[in-house]
Design a protein with these regions (language model features):
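Active-site regions of oxyanion-processing enzymes, predominantly non-cytosolic
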Residues: 2-3
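Gly/Ser/Thr/Pro-enriched helix-cap/hinge segments flanking short amphipathic alpha-helices
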Residues: 41-52, 56-72, 76, 81-225
Length: 225
């Protein structure tokens, strides 16, 4: 499941109500630079939320050690130490970047299985941008990943689809659909490895016919005149 980390982003709060009132009364006698310098500037910490599933999240900022106040406006994650979990790097305005090591593998070695899927596309899309990766594993669980590396302001993550599996040691099915429409399916893939998938080996996959359901939107133009 995908967790969420939110960077605070702004060194100066232009929506501060006291500043808005102050600007209205002082704008005629102060230069623009003087007004900008008077905007409140307070560092605050970033926020982290753990995905519990079913669209529910727990706020885990303190528990995950994200406590340092900062002005952060970009972030990326990658397995920097190649131990199987994703580490986290955040850019701080006018300050050093922060690097956070993920210790879940060291703390819970039997509950930290993973699968990495590395894509190699064709000559027109070497990285495989836009490819759809879906895995199915224990208890009918599924995870999906639409491959795009961009995260936040001027930030890019490791070009690998990373799936945390918990205690699961074998993935029943890995399905990749490329932008070309072709796809590949892999069965019974062992955890804790990197699966290299090349579009050159993709084929047209059969599609199951799904029952048509009522559309989400209905045309009521005539009713409303």
């Amino acid at each position: 499941l995908r967790d969420i980390i939110i960077t605070n982003g702004y060194p100066r709060d232009v929506t501060d109500q006291d500043f808005i009132a102050y600007r209205a009364s002082m704008s005629s006698i102060m230069t623009r630079m003087m007004l900008l310098d008077s905007i409140p500037s307070v560092k605050i910490k970033n926020y982290a939320y753990r995905n519990k599933g079913n669209l529910k999240f727990d706020e885990v900022t303190e528990a995950w050690g994200i406590t340092e106040p900062s002005f952060s406006n970009g972030a990326a994650y990658a397995d920097l130490d190649n131990d199987g979990d994703l580490d986290y790097v955040v850019n701080n305005i006018n300050d050093s970047a922060s690097v956070f090591r993920n210790n879940v593998v060291q703390q819970k070695p039997h509950e930290s299985n993973y699968l990495k899927v590395q894509l190699k596309g064709g000559k027109d899309n070497v990285q495989g941008y836009g490819a759809w990766v879906e895995i199915s594993y224990a208890n009918n669980q599924k995870q999906v990943y639409e491959y795009t590396p961009y995260r936040g302001y001027l930030s890019s993550v490791d070009p690998t689809a990373h799936f945390g599996l918990g205690k699961t040691q074998t993935v029943k099915e890995v399905k990749i659909i490329w932008q070309s429409g072709k796809g590949q399916i892999f069965k019974n893939v062992k955890a804790n490895k990197t699966l290299l998938v090349e579009e050159a080996n993709a084929q047209v996959l059969p599609t199951a016919k799904e029952a048509m359901s009522a559309p989400l939107l209905a045309d009521v133009t005539d009713i409303l005149n």
